[in-house]
Amino acid sequence: MFRYLTSGESHGEGLYVILEGVPAGLKVDLDYINHELSRRQLGYGRGERMKIEKDEAQILTGVRGGFATGAPITIKVKNRDYENWEKFMRTTGEIEPGREVTVPRPGHADLAGGLKYGHKDLRNVLERASARETAVRVAAGAVAKLFLAEFGVRIYSHVLRIGSVEVEYPGGLPEEELKKADEHPLRCLDAQVEGRMLKWVDRARENGDTLGGIFEVVVFGLPPGLGSYVHWDRKLDGRLAGALMAIPSAKGVEIGDGIALANIPGRMAVDEIYYENGHFYRKTNKAGGLEGGVTNGMPLIAKVSLKPIPTQVKPLKSVDIVTKETKPAQVERSDITAVPAAGVVGEAVTALVLMESFLEKFGGDRIEETKRNYQNYLQSIANY
């Protein structure tokens, strides 16, 4: 069974992830993991934290000589800002006063988390709830991408919307175009539309505001048959949507044409099936590569809508949990928009879900065993 668990706080010593079930023999490329971490820090409109942190991974366990041993893999991403926070975040001894939070920020987990766990200092909530945690999800996702690459699977993301400025690509984008997303400051592939997006970000910065948007994840090279239609909790679209919704600020997930399919007649909402040269195919991909919770061999496409980051430079009204007086909400460092970076996180969590699905389908304690099972499956469907 493949699974992962993260730990750590935003201003603690570091962030950690443990991955269990990675097949022995998989090549684990530290440079590639660090490359993926650097991609998460890309994007116009990022906050001051990105000037402090240059995320780099340390592989602590489960890898020897660059290859997975089959034991749990532990990865650490150090928080460089910890040296400024050690006296406020140390795990033993007394915590020095000065960084307490008693005024919750609307739109964050602060108040709900304080009520749930009984914290009187809401820093205990916001430190763990912070989007900083996604750094180790990206590190874990990099390992999953390395695994999927062994089977020819490629994952990309790009930005479709910032604020009210949106670009549409009827029929989707070719893989060669998607490879270029990181060359653009907002990871939007339409330069003209991106120019308008950049102006929106600048305007939001001037106004002390934040912006949400939409990113899209596209996966090529998946075989048909991942996931299941047999039980609700094994449907791949449900599991994928859950992982994408767990990205901070995510408020909606669409698979394929998603919500737009609700507005058209049924005959226009499905992808007709054709057969030629020994294989089944479709001329359209409105389903986004998933039918009945199972991959159908077409590219997997998912869109994620993000709300604006709720932390505001001009704080909103809140209530002090100690005095119960109305006060301005706590102000923390924040991005103007995190949509470009969230796309990279989206790639990572998609890769993790797909790796889990691959190992459920093909098994294998060793990567050679998984590959052999995969090739046998491809042969069986070729003869269908």
Curated annotation (Swiss-Prot):
Q: What is its EC number?
A: 4.2.3.5
PROSITE patterns, per the entry: CHORISMATE_SYNTHASE_2 (PS00788)
State the UniProt keywords alphabetically.
Amino-acid biosynthesis, Aromatic amino acid biosynthesis, FAD, Flavoprotein, FMN, Lyase, NADP
Q: Which reaction does it catalyse?
A: 5-O-(1-carboxyvinyl)-3-phosphoshikimate = chorismate + phosphate
Q: Name one GO cellular component term.
A: cytosol
The cofactor note from the UniProt entry for this protein is: Reduced FMN (FMNH(2)).
Q: Which cofactor does it need?
A: FMNH2
CDD domains with a match to the protein in the record: Chorismate_synthase
User: What this chain does, per the record?
Assistant: This reaction introduces a second double bond into the aromatic ring system.
Quaternary structure note:
Homotetramer.
Q: What is this protein called?
A: Chorismate synthase
Species in which this protein is naturally found: Carboxydothermus hydrogenoformans (strain ATCC BAA-161 / DSM 6008 / Z-2901)
